[in-house]
Amino acid sequence: MKTAALGMALALAAGAVLAGDQQAHNTLTAAEKAAGWKLLFDGRDLNGWREFKKTTIGPGWQVKDGVITLVDPAKADDIITTDKYANFDLVFDWKISKNGNSGVYYHVIETGDHGYETGPEYQLLDNAHGEPPLQQAASLFGLYAPSKDVTRPVGTFNHSRLVVDHGHVEHWLNGVKVAEYQIGSADFKARVAGTKFAHWPLFATADTGYISLQDHESVVAFRDIKIKPLK
């Protein structure tokens, strides 16, 4: 009995240590702060964001239980950061509804009617929806397909990373690098030329711009949005 009790006590102690080591959502560790990371979402409100070409955010976007959720696409638009970013390392968690579709744009400028006219898109998708590879989760939408599907089951959070460094871009999903490209390269330009993006002359031309969360008529949720500006 004493041996069993001791074993139980040790197990509980180990669990407490693990729980203590688990970082709270929407926070930065001391090491992250020292390395230059900053939060784009603090888990409480949408300060630091606004809708595209607006100064406010409609009721379709809500914050609850430490998560940004697009709950009513009919009452929302794409939201963008209030600050612009050039070169950066961006991480975020996201989950999508069944058959859902969304995305994260970068280097968005407020020219034209929509963010996708200027900003490349890190695609977010329920891959079970059956879209082609160029439109699957973690693709550069319409241009570069992910090398593999490492998405988690719909309704659970995925972890994404987007690195933009002087035109060299990496897409990561759940710890795996799945796409890599160079904006402005011959290959990139050739791919753009064969798509709808060719109709927008400012697409992927800005060296700096806003980061945007897409309203694509699907329920989507975000948390742990962090960015580290790069030189």
Model regions and ranges:
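Carbohydrate-interacting regions of secretory-pathway proteins
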Residues: 18-231
